[in-house]
Structures are given as structure tokens and as C-alpha cells.
Amino acid sequence: KKGIGEGSIRTCFCTGVLPVTMDDLTSGYNIAEILTLEPEFLNMLGFTYEEAGAYLRYVLDKYTEGQDRFNEIWQLNNYDGYRFRPGAEPLFNSTILTYFFKKFAVRKGGIPRELVDENLRTDIGWIRRLTLSLENAKEMLDALVINDELPYNVPDLSSKFNKKKFFDKTFYPVSLFYLGMTTLRNNYRMVLPNLTMRSIYMDYYNEMNHIEGGPPRYVPTHEPFTEDRRFEPLVQNYFEQYLGQFPAQVFDKINENFIRCSFFELCSRYLSSYYTFAIEQNNSAGRSDFEMTGIPGTDYYKDDRLVEFKYFKAKEAEHMLALNAPRPEDVAQVLAYA
């Protein structure tokens, strides 16, 4: 403050700090302004689609034989989706996109075995500290992995806030937003931005709810798939070994979104060396629930799978279980996606 008053300091920019930190930093004077969410500064927070495309072309030119594989490598659903203002252009997370390109370059054009930088995974204890109780943590995770959204207030995004408010239950969405864990769907709701964060949050959910994820449950099914390519055992294994661990009362709130996310997390855990994944993928006929596509340069290239999950009420169970073939309308829906 003294330096600005004397004229020795004209402007001081602070980057990479949370508003809660800024509140402490500027508590002695009231001449600080948060510029993060101003339209002119939004693109500083990540890569635009144009910038990410140029970045990929540079990496392809420098570390591979050229740009012929551009469309194959251009996987948008793992690293993009960050929107820092309602209606703003979605951005790529610069940290995890650079992680992918770095691994891609080291492998001389090979797809990294791990698509998620482990440094992004927050210790589950930290989530508990933010929410202050196990009950609050479970409630927050339910909202994100089951309901796929968290309501928020737009004015809270641009306000300075202190440590007490940061840990307030009603402020969780904004706290997660500034930690890079959620993004804006619209003026009212936040969501997980991409498959990377969905995978991380499903992992949190499983750990917090004591869902066993050990290899003995899943490897005996996923390993044979890499040879025989039989998809049905993967689905059966998911329902028996994963969903079979949940108590009956949990199924009162489980929905299609949870099924999509948890099935994706399980498959990607064991098959990410061979396939890339997408959920709620836009197609000419609508949005498919789940898709897995063989990675270019592997034996699985052009081996594509598409799944459409259907939710039925308990009273319909007997009729559905009696069927010995898919319903014609469901087959037609999947064929339209293909």
C-alpha cells in the first residue's frame, strides 16, 4: 500500500492464489480487485480449443512423423470442459493436457498408459477436512456422482471470502470450483468438467463408501477380454462384483448417471492401455451412454463398443428378466448411434 502511494509500485498482479488467500493478503487495504472471472482474462486459466489444437500439431511435428494422426489423438473428453464464467468458452486444463503431451512425446507417439496425472488426485482426507464431517462429504459426493450437479450462487464466484466461509457447507460448490474440481454448467449449477475428474471422484466415492476395488474381483474378467473381446462378461462382472457390494437401500437413489460413471471408472481402470472412453457422447441420433474405442497403434484400433443403459422400476423387473433378447426399440436406438 505504501509503495503504491509513493508511486514506486503502480500495479501488482497476484496469480495462482485462491480468493481465500487474497482475503488475508489484502486485509490491510481495500484497493485489491479480483480479475479472474473478467471475460478479458478467462483464457489465461487454460488452453482454448484453438490453442490446444496448435499445441498438439507442434507435438506431432516434433516427436512423430507428422500430423496424419491429429484426428486420432484429438481426445477432448479427458482434459477439456472447464468453464469459468456462465456461457464462456470451455477450456482445457493446461496441467493435465501438458501431462498427456509430455508422456506422448516420451513414448514417441504412443498413447500414455495412465491418462490421469496422479498429482491431481487429492487425498481423501482433504475432502473430509473441507466438508468437516463424513456425512457432509458423502452428501457432496452423492450430488456429483449421482445427480451430476451442485447448485451455486453466481455472486459467490467473484466475492472475496475468508477461511470460515471456505469451509461453510453452502459454499462447497465455490470452494471446489476454485480448487479446479468442478466447473460451471450454467448460471445455477456446477458439474464435473471431464472424464478425468469423473474418474477421480468415483475413486473418492468408492473409498469413502468402502467399496472393495481389489484386482481379485475384476482381473479374472478383464484380462480374458483383452484376448476374446467378449463384452458381456464385463457387464456381468460389474453388476455382480461392483454393484453387488451396495446395500439394498442405496439403489433407491442410484440412477443412470451413476451407472455410467462407475462402469466407466471400472473399465478404464483395467482397459485404459487398449481403449479410450466416452460417456454421454454426442452422435447424430442423440447421446450414447458409454463408448470405448480402440487406441490407434494397438491391436484394438477400430474395435469400438457402444452401450446404452436402461433404467427400469422394480415392478418391471420380472418382465425384463424374462426377456431372452433385447427389445427392438432399444436395438434400433443403438444402431442409430452407430
Question: What kind of feature is each model-predicted range?
Answer:
Residues 32-33, 90-327, 331, 338:
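Extended alpha-helical interface modules used as scaffolds for assembling large macromolecular complexes
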Residues 5, 30-34:
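Short, surface-exposed basic-aromatic patches at helix termini and helix-loop junctions that form
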Residues 49, 53, 328-334:
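Amphipathic alpha-helical transducer elements in NTP-driven molecular machines
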Residues 2, 54, 58-62, 265, ...:
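A generic structural signal for well-ordered alpha-helical segments enriched in polar/charged residues
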